[in-house]
């Protein structure tokens, strides 16, 4: 298969691929046996990222398109080493290798989610500021569902007993800023809505199962 055929296949079936892998993730991580399988999490996130990259339309400004990877990683590295702007927290080894206590995959996850929200809202409005605000709100809402599950699975831990309010404020503000700064690098991707549906569904279901 050539590149065009591979992209066509994933555009047609990529949503099923990521849905099946996340369903398997729920089965493996939703029970008492989850400690035996949680270290497979990076493979699932990597698959999600690769599928999203393959299904993206032609990228005319690749550096701007990929910039959220670096932005997300650097701000997380700042956060884990200084406590600013999210609060005092630290990552475990579950999300794979990293630098200065920050997994490399966390920057990739910022990119996938930010680009997905940006793409979805770009289909509704042409106002870049409104799109960026909606992206920030979407990222904030998703993080609310992610936090209890990620903490329970040992992805990261907070020094405080509860997730600090500044985490959510920073998540929204940074998502808005990153979306606005990189808006001109956005491209359409048929997988965007499925990334959000699957990721949202995964963390909602996992949150229910782990209560």
Please give the residue ranges for each predicted region.
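Aromatic-rich, lipid-facing transmembrane alpha helices and their immediate juxtamembrane interface loops
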Residues: 1-211
